[in-house]
């Protein structure tokens, strides 16, 4: 990482930490942090005292320090970013929390509300149902010294073929995530069955995550929070209840880690998934919603 990239990362981190402390939600997603750390050449940036705007591909991020809000800095950063991009370039921007100020800024610059992502949470003090896998299915942890990584990528690509963020994960993206401090191979659970050639095939996976106590996951400082990070099922194996089985297996793993709360993200219109998660004890608060705007 050269000096410019390091300075950008430091400036972004300082403002993001302050915004997270004030708002109770991290203002940048994991993909943005990974790009800043590993692929700074992909990041276009507009940095001012008290705030910044970033564009990575078609994704726009804009964050203003709490002490610099209400002075037009956000509008100025957004105008500068839009002026520096190709006319008519499609853009997507997330508001991590349904903030009225973000909605007003988006509307004033031609962005429309496009998606809502719910945060659902489960308090782990309540007992979990017993785990029962279907006949012929084994749930086990990821093994780094096997072909598991390739199988996870295969299932992920099939399961999220129509999902713009998750479906594009490749071997490099996977390796970057596995190099993160939070990665635990025991928390990446695979549902497998016997293959026709006598080997083993992966039917689906549940990748769990534990946020450190300072990660702003909403449980208070110093408190670790678990996450249902990704659940992916091979379309050829759907209809067997594997999504619920893998989700429950991950919850048992996170319970063993001692986290008091587990969160997950789900599209607000994915009623079947919401019903499954509600049946496992997850709830959603109206203000625990992330909103995507498009232009």
Curated annotation (Swiss-Prot):
Pfam families: Acetyltransf_1. It catalyses: 1D-myo-inositol 2-(L-cysteinylamino)-2-deoxy-alpha-D-glucopyranoside + acetyl-CoA = mycothiol + CoA + H(+). The keyword Acyltransferase applies. It comes from the Bacteria. SUPFAM superfamilies: Acyl-CoA N-acyltransferases (Nat). Gene3D superfamilies: 3.40.630.30. 1D-myo-inositol 2-(L-cysteinylamino)-2-deoxy-alpha-D-glucopyranoside binds at residues 30, 165, 209, 227, 265. Transmembrane segments: none annotated. Its EC number is 2.3.1.189. Keywords: Acyltransferase, Repeat, Transferase. Acetyl-CoA 1 binds at residues 62-64. Acetyl-CoA 2 binds at residues 231-233, 238-244. PROSITE patterns: GNAT. It is an enzyme of class 2 (transferase). Catalyzes the transfer of acetyl from acetyl-CoA to desacetylmycothiol (Cys-GlcN-Ins) to form mycothiol. Belongs to the acetyltransferase family. MshD subfamily. NCBIfam families: mycothiol_MshD. Monomer. This is Mycothiol acetyltransferase. The lineage of its organism: Bacteria, Bacillati, Actinomycetota, Actinomycetes, Propionibacteriales. The gene is mshD.
């Amino acid at each position: 990482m050269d000096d410019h990239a390091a300075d950008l990362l430091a400036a972004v981190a300082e403002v993001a930490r302050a915004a997270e402390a004030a708002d109770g939600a991290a203002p940048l997603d994991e993909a943005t942090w990974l790009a800043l750390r590993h692929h700074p050449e992909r990041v276009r940036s507009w940095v001012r005292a008290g705030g910044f705007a970033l564009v990575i591909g078609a994704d726009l991020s804009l964050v203003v320090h709490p002490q610099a809000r209400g002075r037009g800095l956000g509008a100025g950063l957004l105008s500068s970013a839009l002026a520096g991009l190709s006319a008519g370039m499609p853009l997507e921007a997330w508001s991590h929390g349904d903030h009225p100020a973000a909605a007003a800024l988006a509307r004033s610059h031609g962005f429309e509300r496009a998606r809502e992502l719910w945060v659902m949470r489960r308090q782990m003090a309540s007992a979990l149902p017993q785990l029962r896998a279907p006949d012929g299915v084994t749930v086990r942890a990821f093994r780094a010294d096997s072909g598991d990584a390739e199988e996870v990528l295969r299932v992920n690509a099939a399961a999220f073929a129509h999902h713009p963020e998750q479906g594009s994960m490749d071997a490099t993206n996977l390796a970057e995530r596995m190099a993160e401090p939070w990665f635990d191979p025991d928390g990446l659970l695979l549902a497998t069955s016997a293959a026709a050639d006598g080997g083993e095939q992966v039917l689906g996976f549940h990748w769990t995550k534990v946020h450190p106590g300072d990660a702003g996951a909403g449980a208070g400082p110093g408190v670790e929070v678990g996450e249902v990070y990704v659940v992916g099922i091979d379309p050829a194996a759907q209809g067997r209840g594997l999504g619920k089985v893998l989700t429950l297996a991950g919850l048992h793993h996170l319970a063993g880690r001692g986290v008091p709360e587990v969160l997950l993200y789900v599209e607000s219109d994915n009623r079947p998934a919401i019903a499954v998660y509600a049946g496992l004890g997850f709830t959603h608060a109206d203000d625990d919603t992330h909103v995507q705007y498009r232009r």
